[in-house]
Amino acid sequence: MVAFSDKQEGLVNGAYEAFKADIPKYSVVFYTTILEKAPAAKNLFSFLANGVDATNPKLTGHAEKLFGLVRDSAAQLRASGGVVADAALGAVHSQKAVNDAQFVVVKEALVKTLKEAVGDKWSDELGTAVELAYDELAAAIKKAY
C-alpha cells in the first residue's frame, strides 16, 4: 500500500486540469517528447503514422485518456493505497510488448508536459505526486498483463 494524501491528489488533479485547458497543444508536447526520446515508439501508436498532428482526434483522445488515468490513479491511491488497472489495458500493453524502458519514456514525457502546462505552479511536491501516481498506474498495467 502507498500513502497518498489529499494534497497530493489535489496537486495531480490541478495538473490534469491545466493539461485539459489546451489538450491539442499539450498532446503535441507529450508525443513529440516521446518520439524525441524513443523514435521507435511511433510504431506503437497507429495515430502517429503521419507524425504528431494536434488536429488528429485519436492523438488528442489517447493523450487525454492517459493523463486521465494518471489522475484516476491518484484518486485510487488516496482512497485505497493501491491502483487497479483494467484487464483490457494490460492486454493492449502486453500485445504491443511495452517494456519497462518505454514506461519510463512515457513518464518523462508526462512530467515534461505537465510541467509546461502548470508553468510556475510546478513544484517538487507536484512532480513527486505525478510520478508516484504514474508509477503505480504502470505497475498495475504490468500486473494486468
UniProtKB/Swiss-Prot annotation:
GO terms for biological process: nodulation. O2 binds at H62. Belongs to the plant globin family. Keywords: Cytoplasm, Heme, Iron, Metal-binding, Nitration, Nitrogen fixation, Nodulation, Nucleus, Oxygen transport, Phosphoprotein, Transport. Residues 3-145 form the Globin domain. Nitrated in effective nodules and particularly in hypoxic conditions; this mechanism may play a protective role in the symbiosis by buffering toxic peroxynitrite NO(2)(-). Nitration level decrease during nodule senescence. The keyword Iron applies. It comes from the Eukaryota. This is Leghemoglobin-2. Monomer. It is found in: Cytoplasm, Cytosol; Nucleus. Heme b binds at S46, K65, H93, K96. Root nodules. The modification Nitrated tyrosine is found at Y26, Y31, Y134. PANTHER family: LEGHEMOGLOBIN-RELATED (PTHR22924), NON-SYMBIOTIC HEMOGLOBIN 2 (PTHR22924:SF92). The modification Phosphoserine is found at S46. GO terms for molecular function: heme binding; metal ion binding; oxygen binding; oxygen carrier activity. Leghemoglobin that reversibly binds oxygen O(2) through a pentacoordinated heme iron. In root nodules, facilitates the diffusion of oxygen to the bacteroids while preventing the bacterial nitrogenase from being inactivated by buffering dioxygen, nitric oxide and carbon monoxide, and promoting the formation of reactive oxygen species (ROS, e.g. H(2)O(2)). This role is essential for symbiotic nitrogen fixation (SNF). GO terms for cellular component: cytosol; nucleus. Pfam families: Globin (PF00042).
